[in-house]
Every structure is written in C-alpha cells, then in structure tokens.
Amino acid sequence: MSLLTLKNRRERGFFDGQFLIAMPGMEDRNFARTVIYICAHSDAGAMGFVINRPQSLTFTDVLLHLDMIKQEDSIVLPKRAREFPIQTGGPVESGRGFVLHSDDYSSDSSIPVSDDICLTATLDIVRAISKGDGPTRATMLLGYSSWAAGQLESEVVNNGWLTCPANEELIFDRSLDDKYERALAGMGVTAAMLSAEAGHA
C-alpha cells in the first residue's frame, strides 16, 4: 500500500490504529523485535511505521541535506529542533521522510490516520519544526513498511505478529531501547513467555 492509497481511502480497515508486535521468532531482520504502528489497512494491503528503530541521521542532518540551513546555522537552531527525533520507519522508500504527529498541527497535505494522529510528508512541517513550531508531539520516520493485499493477514494468522490497539504515548516516546518490551508488557506478556510457548507448539 502506498501513501497515495492512504490519502484516498474512504474506510478504516481492521488493523488501522493497531500495533504489530513482532513475535520472537521473526526471521526478517527488517522487522525482528519491532513495534509497528499501522496507519492504513484495506483489501489493497497495509502501510505502517516501525516506531522503535533508531536512525543515525539527526534532524540537523536532514535540514542540511534539504538545503534548508547552512552548516553555520545549525548551532542557532531551537533546542526542540536540535533534539527532534529521527527514526527508521521501514525498508520501503527509506530515503523519504514522514512525520507522524499530534493533530494540533495540520496543513493541506496532512492525512488523519486516527482521531488524534496525523501524517505529513511535505517540507512545510519540516520548516515549522526547524523554527521550533509545528505539532506538540511528533517524530520523523525515514521509510515505511508496506504489505500487499492479504499479506499482513497471512502473517498474523501464521503467528508472525501480535496485534493490539496502538498507544499514543508509546508512539511518541523517545526511549526506543525498551519499547518492544513495554509494548509486550502492555499485553501482559514477555518475549520469554512467547518463546516458551513457541517451543511447545
């Protein structure tokens, strides 16, 4: 599923607004120990973002790459901009940036993905954040995760993923190292429990 499909969708799918939490046996290195926020799901497929993978680039690096600032300007960026988090959202279009954010910021290109969360993928929001403005809560993700028609359903049925309602606090929490464990804890399980169950299946 693409961003265009997300923008043109009319109905929410079953996995919309859900977390996918990778089972301990996930072999795909792109998704091992990941928590994914599903933004769109329909008969055409699904699209979402990994929310617990760090990215080596900083927001300053992004601004420099986009020629929005010069190197000497980086030291005068607002503190909020200097510390703005960048994460790896998935293996599809990994050079493209997307901003998941609270709905207190909106532009013509912003796409509502839930009652409280929007997705914007244009330079307007990058400029706003660079000035210390923009949404109250946000994170930039490079790349996204995508599934073809029926693919996600098949992976869930085959015990590739656990699913649960998404938690906004966890989406925007900047502590990534233990986010996987906290997502599991929210379901009342641990990775060790799941590994033991798989071993006795």
Curated annotation (Swiss-Prot):
InterPro entries assigned: AlgH-like
Record-stated family: Belongs to the UPF0301 (AlgH) family.
Gene3D superfamilies: VC0467-like
Name of this chain's protein: UPF0301 protein RL1035
HAMAP family: UPF0301
GO cellular component: cytosol
Pfam families given in the database record: DUF179
